[in-house]
Amino acid sequence: MARQVKRKSGADRNDGGGKYNSNNDRSVKRGRSELRTVTRTSRRDRGQDEQHNSHGTGGDFDIEGNVKDGRENVEQDKEEEEEEEDEDKGKAYEALLTLLKIEQKQEMKSGNKMENGRGLENTGSETGEKDNSAVKDDEDEDEDDFGEDENAGVVLEDQKEEEEEEKEDEDEDEEEEEDDEDTPAGINNDAFELHFNQPTEEYLEQEDKLVLKENAKWNIHKKESYDDLSLTSITQSPPGSSITIPSSLLKQKGTDISEYPLKKRVYTAFESTYGPSISKLESILLQPILNYQDINYQYKTFLNSSYRKLYALHALNHIYKTRDRILKNTAKLHQLNEDGDDLELRDQGFTRPKVLILLPTRDACNEIVEMIIKLSGTDQQENKKKFTTQFYTKAETRTNKPGDFQDAFKGNNNDFFCIGMKLTRKTLKLYSSFYSSDIILASPLGLSMILENPDKKKRQYDFISSIEVLIVDRANQIEMQNWDHVNTVMKYINKVPKEFHDADFSRIRMWSINDQAKLLRQTLVFSEYQTPAINNLVSSKSHNLAGKIRFKPVITSENSIMNSIGLRIKQVFQRFPSESPLADPDSRFKFFTNSIIPHLLQSSSYGNGIMIYIPSYFDYLRVKQHFKDSTKYNFGAIDEYSSQSKLTRTRHEFALGKIQIILYTERLHYFRRYEISGVKNLIMYVPPSNPLFYKELIRFIGKSVFKEECDLDLTWAKLIYSKWDANALERIVGNERAPVLCSSQNEQYEFR
């Protein structure tokens, strides 16, 4: 017989995606009221159930209000057994689990949540997938909340049990690799060995001083052009000297995947999934990735997604190489101990996780996990059903939106998750505890909530102390969410841990102990287009001694976004003087308020219909306040934080001409993709980050012309820029025009 337990979400709640929860959980949820239903199998007889139901309606009761009744209906022996179970489970050494278990354990010891607290745990650990209704969402939940209350990322087994299972799995026989990595020829051709095990302490000390302490300038080592791919690359090397990469590894390989130094199981899985060949572009990307060089790659459009299989391949190859190296060294040490000899073999970090993948949404995470499963060569996957429930949904975006919008917000677009993945000989396990995981997949928001818990005693960052490969995918989507969370992750990654988690110091590499891990961490960043924040991630916050490569698409006037608008609207580019990037916001505001606003209506042939597009929210607030305090214009302002009623009302009044001027932010456009009616003239306060937005904004005017609300010859769009906007301008007008706009004597240019 089953009974239902309803509880309100609180500080002890555990949300899906492995995300961390704190006492300010409701603020994270943007104030949404949540009520979850948990059903578990009752072990009492019918009489006890009837007695219990007499205290409530249909067996439903509130945990906090009916604790006493719950205690009276629990058998003493069952209570003691479950308490012992909880104590054993509470030993699991995992960041998210620890935070949850401390709260639950304290409440159980004080008698506040006796049976019900254990019931929730037993639902996850005992019934598991046997009872599909064990943990479910309330039917009235929004789609955005689907699966948020699942214990994603939480491990309820004892850590010792995990280690024993892993040891048993490691002891099983495995087919030997064809190439022995321990031979001199193998070492000289193995980028993994050269990058992580060969650098000497003296070399790393020297580079630590130059790169980290003195912040010496990196050198441009090589520039290459791939005309047939409309692509260029710039390779930078660190000050001093970079890690020596043999010519055999630097020589450009072909499109046959067998030419690349991959573990046999990864190569076999890749070949069976994607075939034996890769494209020329993929070969150009894969080689430096496998050489552990940093990559900053602009894939230009969401349709170009083939690079993802390359970093999934690399992540698995790295994990398997690490694992095999540790196993071989362990066997060597065991043999030497039997012979009475002594040897120092260092092959580990402080903690197990080696790869961190940052992604914007759960749907993006689901896509990568599915790809990794295909390439892993594992026979079985644990907790796959649970993962699919929390990370995958068939919900589709509206088809009247642009393709890139549909791609960004398809499926489960929840941006709050952090999940561990553990790989053994035959099994890929999802929801592994962070400290026993090989790969961590997270949104910056989900991970930062673990790293910077408001309660300092509960903060956990040790599990990312030994990350050797950092991958940031769909960086533009992450930036539109909140780039501050990425900065938080970069603050803690490769930081020496607070505790050492039973680490074997005789096996830890010296560069980890000496706090030099960041000098060898590889960073891979993939984005549609480059922004200062994304570029800074590789140029300033990555210190990989193997070098950095920036790939950049070639945008000409012919394939630029301006050339694809299809409307002969007057487009004016107005340059203002700016001394430095730091002074740019103030210089822009001064120019705008002194030169643009006073003649705003006079410059228009119409008394209304002026849109001012502002990418930065801080610039938007500044301009909005100026309009309010220093002008008499009848204006409206809408942004990503505006209520739906205000958005609807302001757009309607602007379309009718009741509002002369409307202020419109870039993030609002990104998240909603409105087609604003009534736009007759357009001012872009800063060049749009996404070149597609430039085209969409210009077409607002085209829509008004089509409706015969204005004349094509009397409309215009004006873009305000400085020389520091060169990259954004290049995406709009092409690489031939952008230098002219930024450095010539004329300050104003007109295009049609």
Curated annotation (Swiss-Prot):
Query: What is known about its subunit structure?
Result: Component of the ribosomal small subunit (SSU) processome composed of at least 40 protein subunits and snoRNA U3.
Instruction: State its location(s).
Output: Nucleus, Nucleolus
Membership in a protein family: Belongs to the UTP25 family.
GO annotation terms (biological process) = maturation of SSU-rRNA from tricistronic rRNA transcript (SSU-rRNA, 5.8S rRNA, LSU-rRNA)
Source organism (scientific name): Lodderomyces elongisporus (strain ATCC 11503 / CBS 2605 / JCM 1781 / NBRC 1676 / NRRL YB-4239)
Here the segments flagged for biased composition (Basic and acidic residues) are: 26-53, 65-76, 102-118, 127-136
InterPro entries hit by this protein: P-loop_NTPase (IPR027417), UTP25 (IPR010678), UTP25_C (IPR053939), UTP25_NTPase-like (IPR053940)
Q: One GO term of the cellular component aspect? A: small-subunit processome
Q: According to its UniProt entry, what is the function of this protein?
A: DEAD-box RNA helicase-like protein required for pre-18S rRNA processing, specifically at sites A0, A1, and A2.
What this protein is called in its record is U3 small nucleolar RNA-associated protein 25
Signal peptide (from-to): none
Residues of the region (Disordered) are: 1-189
Which residues fall in a compositionally biased region of kind Acidic residues? 77-87, 137-151, 159-183
Q: Which gene encodes it?
A: UTP25
Molecular function in Gene Ontology: rRNA binding; U3 snoRNA binding
| Gene3D superfamilies in alphabetical order | P-loop containing nucleotide triphosphate hydrolases
Keywords from UniProt, A to Z, are: Nucleus, Ribonucleoprotein, Ribosome biogenesis, rRNA processing
